[in-house]
């Protein structure tokens, strides 16, 4: 079984909705890193040197490769990444090797068989 790592940067107000969307699309879990900061193409506004941007969360999900595109597209739709500027970014990376995912792999085996 081969995996992808989905990485999502999103306004913290959308985290719960995106976690639900990922699970509904086949993800078996998610790790959330709170209070991330960043800057996009447009420089953020500041007030006396302090950024006024909303806090971001980083969502990390290891998913089976055959399910990754469907999950990524569902995240895009729920998060409105392509329709509203500045709402978030999601991408996937290849996972060369992983340990500690035996339970997820067992659950995913049935879902992947249906998918392919």
Model-derived segments and spans:
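Positively charged, small/polar-rich N-terminal and surface patches that mediate targeting and assembly
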Residues: 1-116
């Amino acid at each position: 079984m081969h995996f992808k790592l989905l990485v999502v940067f999103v306004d913290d107000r959308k985290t719960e909705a995106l976690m639900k969307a990922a699970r509904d699309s086949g993800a078996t879990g998610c790790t959330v890193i709170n209070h991330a900061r960043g800057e996009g193409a447009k420089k953020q506004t500041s007030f006396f040197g302090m950024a006024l941007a909303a806090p971001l969360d980083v969502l990390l999900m290891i998913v089976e490769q055959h399910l990754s595109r469907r999950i990524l597209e569902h995240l895009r739709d729920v998060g409105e990444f392509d329709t509203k500027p500045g709402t978030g970014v999601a991408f996937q990376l290849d996972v060369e090797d992983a340990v500690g995912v035996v339970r997820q792999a067992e659950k995913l085996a049935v879902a992947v068989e249906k998918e392919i």
